[in-house]
């Protein structure tokens, strides 16, 4: 199966789908150039090598035959050209010159079964977290898919990240088996202990922003200005993706800010504009690009969306620049 995305919400959702369905082996991240045919050529090779366009029924038959199965995540990205400031990029954009770096980030995932992982010599199931066993696993994959990439266990590589978010694994609470069974920890359907959270950098930036909102309260003579600032800040907190790891972090941030306000002014924050946050939960979303679409169709869709988005951002930059000049 091939999944496409160009915003964090869709990308993180696809990765969570991989984790839920036990696609826990991953190849290194590939960064492919969209301004050449590099991305198209690589994806065509992967489709043939890993049978990515097979139906769910065909994939199921492979699993029954003790074969590994694969999925590909294709994430479209863009950024300012290296070495150029924001203004320089928009000036180039105004002249119809190349101003942005447009790339594809590609992730190959693999799902295996105990039957596939069974070592015929030792009659033991190979461990994905053992280095020597992982070499054997990759050899077994190579025998079925010649020229295959090297795969690693998802928990042993650098966290997959997207924008302000990174994939992490939550540890199960240290409770007795009886307590866990009472809460259906092991019997709950489609549950994964993987989630997304803010990166350390994003978390620290959000923490500092919260401190500024609290500390500026004293310097704002017009308290309505402080209230407006808080309202905007709370909306920003509520705008993060609603994964449990993120919600937990936002809750921690909010608690720290309430305590800071109390310590600084000896007054409850809720008496001065604070309110209970309404944090979202992730829901099933319909992807704007249909799964298993051809790469050419997916790229065309992304470029259309990108052009519209860049034009809007350019107009905002232009209006801001004109206002600054006046």
Stretches with model-predicted labels:
Residues 1, 9-14, 153-326:
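Right-hand nucleic-acid polymerase module
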Residues 1-157, 320-325:
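Conserved polymerase palm-domain catalytic core
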């Amino acid at each position: 199966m091939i999944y496409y995305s160009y915003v964090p919400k869709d990308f993180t959702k696809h990765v969570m789908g991989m984790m839920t369905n036990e696609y826990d082996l991953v190849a290194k991240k590939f960064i492919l150039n969209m301004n050449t045919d590099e991305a198209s050529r690589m994806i065509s090779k992967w489709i043939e090598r890993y049978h990515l366009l097979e139906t769910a029924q065909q994939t199921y038959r492979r699993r029954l035959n003790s074969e590994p199965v694969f999925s590909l995540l294709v994430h479209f990205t863009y950024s300012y050209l290296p070495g150029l400031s924001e203004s320089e990029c928009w000036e180039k954009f105004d002249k119809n010159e190349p101003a942005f770096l447009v790339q594809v980030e590609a992730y190959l995932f693999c799902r295996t079964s105990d039957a596939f992982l069974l070592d015929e010599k030792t009659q033991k199931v190979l461990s994905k977290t053992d280095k020597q066993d992982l070499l054997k696993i990759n050899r077994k994959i190579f025998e079925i898919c010649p020229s295959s990439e090297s795969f690693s266990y998802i928990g042993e590589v650098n966290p997959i990240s997207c924008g302000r978010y990174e994939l992490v694994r939550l540890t199960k609470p240290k409770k007795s088996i009886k307590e866990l069974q009472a809460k259906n920890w092991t019997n709950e359907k489609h549950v994964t202990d993987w989630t997304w959270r803010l990166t350390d950098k994003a978390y620290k930036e959000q923490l500092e922003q919260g401190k500024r909102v609290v500390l500026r309260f004293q310097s704002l003579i017009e308290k309505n200005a402080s209230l407006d600032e808080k309202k905007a800040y709370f909306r920003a907190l509520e705008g993060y993706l609603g994964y449990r790891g993120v919600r937990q972090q936002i809750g921690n941030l909010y608690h720290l800010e309430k305590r800071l306000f109390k310590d600084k002014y000896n007054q409850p924050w809720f008496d001065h504009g604070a309110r209970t946050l309404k944090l979202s939960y992730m829901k099933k979303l319909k992807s704007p690009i249909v799964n298993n679409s051809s790469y050419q169709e997916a790229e065309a869709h992304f470029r259309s969306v990108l052009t519209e988005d860049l034009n809007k951002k350019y107009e905002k930059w232009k209006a801001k620049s004109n206002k600054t000049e006046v």
